[in-house]
Amino acid sequence: MDDDKKLTSKDFLNQLVAKHYEGALQAKAEGKPVVWATSICPQELLETMDLATVYPENHAAAIGARKGALEFIENAEGKGYSSDNCSYARVNLGYADIQKAEAQDIPMPDLLFCCSNICNTVIKWYENLSKTLQIPLILFDMPFNHTYEVPEHSIRYMRGQIEYAIGQLEDFTKRKFDYDKFGEVMELSNATCEWWKKATDWAKVIPSPLNGFDMFNYMAMIVCMRGNADGHRLFKMWHDELEAKAKAGLGPWNSAEEQYRVMWDGIACWPHLSTTFKALKKYGINMVTSTYPDSWNVRYEKNDLSGMAKAYASNYANRNLDYDEDNVVR
């Protein structure tokens, strides 16, 4: 507890980012398998199996934020990948060929883990990686929700895929799946998501103690550390800091007052994040909510596999227009 008093959540965030990548590189060096996974996948399965996992979308965003994306995009397009593909895909496909980035290296994968609840691009992106690298792919095919609520047949379909994926992971690792540990990971993942939600909800206070662009920074860890104790500790720390600021009546910045509050819809513009932040701050504009970071508020009851299936099927990018309109209003 004393460490928490000395350490800010931002300090801890930076430590965890370094720990995440160093751990994956070390696992590879020790001959352990490494997984590349999409950002909103059933990571609880991977956490249960103690598989070192890297998220190419996080990595591509980091490369973009450091102005290093062009080399990888040009490489991917030179191999025939269309410029219509998102830069996340093109940066990663380029990195899979070059395998070196000044911003941050990641180990090459032994297994791919893909869930199509965020977009359809990830399907062909990961299929191409699987074919090029000659490694197995575990794919969760997520039907789009044309109805307002997630239909029961979609929940059953996704649950069946989760159950099948457990068998695939057992075949890949040559180890049995530990269902007791799975329950613990599910519980921790939900608790972490709850602290993430509680922390970001402080933006509802006027003035907001939260600088909305911080959500994009902390988001890296809600992607890759939802199911472990470090992620839980981080978001509890962040929540407590924001609560203290709110009670003290402090706004998002020390050098400016919050005058306008806006919602950010969609993905951050990673190469120009600083420019965007400074331009908005100059006019007292604070981004207090976004449809993007809330995507990782994946919650369900412990040991409820159908609830877990529904939670992963419920991502706003996988919902119909009526639902998305109401989500924006909420």
Predicted regions and their residues:
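An N-terminal, globular interaction/scaffold subdomain
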Residues: A37-D105, D110, N117, W125-Y126
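Internal, well-ordered alpha/beta segment that forms a basic, Gly-enriched binding/recognition surface
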Residues: Y95-D97, E102-W202
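Short, flexible loop segments at the rims of nucleotide/cofactor-binding pockets, characterized by
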Residues: D11-N14, C86-L93, Y316-E325
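Redox- and metal-dependent alpha/beta enzyme cores, enriched for Fe-S-associated oxidoreductases
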Residues: T48-E77, I267-R330
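A short acidic, amphipathic alpha-helical/loop segment
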Residues: L45, K124-N128, T275-A279
